[in-house]
């Protein structure tokens, strides 16, 4: 994920999906004292460790 540019909609979708995964019991990929899934997902996004990819259509 590092070095890639995401639209604000892609970022929102990625963070939301990751927060849901964390809420449902997925392992947290960073060390943190926070228990809020959204805060954890945002920090993971900032650090570039979220294991989610974005597939885009080729530009025409």
From Swiss-Prot:
Part of the RNA polymerase complex. The keyword Glycosyltransferase does not apply. It is found in: Cytoplasm. One of its GO terms (biological process) is transcription by RNA polymerase I. The keyword Transferase applies. It catalyses: RNA(n) + a ribonucleoside 5'-triphosphate = RNA(n+1) + diphosphate. PANTHER family: DNA-DIRECTED RNA POLYMERASE SUBUNIT K (PTHR47227), DNA-DIRECTED RNA POLYMERASES I, II, AND III SUBUNIT RPABC2 (PTHR47227:SF5). DNA-dependent RNA polymerase (RNAP) catalyzes the transcription of DNA into RNA using the four ribonucleoside triphosphates as substrates. InterPro entries: DNA-dir_RNA_polK_14-18kDa_CS (IPR020708), Pol_omega/Rpo6/RPB6 (IPR006110), RPB6/omega-like_sf (IPR036161), Rpo6/Rpb6 (IPR006111). This is DNA-directed RNA polymerase subunit Rpo6. Belongs to the archaeal Rpo6/eukaryotic RPB6 RNA polymerase subunit family. Keywords: Cytoplasm, DNA-directed RNA polymerase, Nucleotidyltransferase, Transcription, Transferase. GO terms for cellular component: cytoplasm; DNA-directed RNA polymerase complex. GO terms for molecular function: DNA binding; DNA-directed RNA polymerase activity. It comes from Methanothrix thermoacetophila (strain DSM 6194 / JCM 14653 / NBRC 101360 / PT) (Methanosaeta thermophila). Its EC number is 2.7.7.6.
């Amino acid at each position: 994920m590092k070095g890639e540019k995401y639209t604000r909609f892609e970022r929102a979708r990625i963070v939301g999906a990751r927060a849901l995964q964390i809420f449902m019991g997925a392992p947290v990929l960073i060390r943190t004292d926070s228990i809020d899934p959204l805060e954890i997902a945002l920090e993971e996004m900032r650090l570039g460790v979220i294991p989610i990819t974005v597939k885009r259509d080729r530009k025409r």
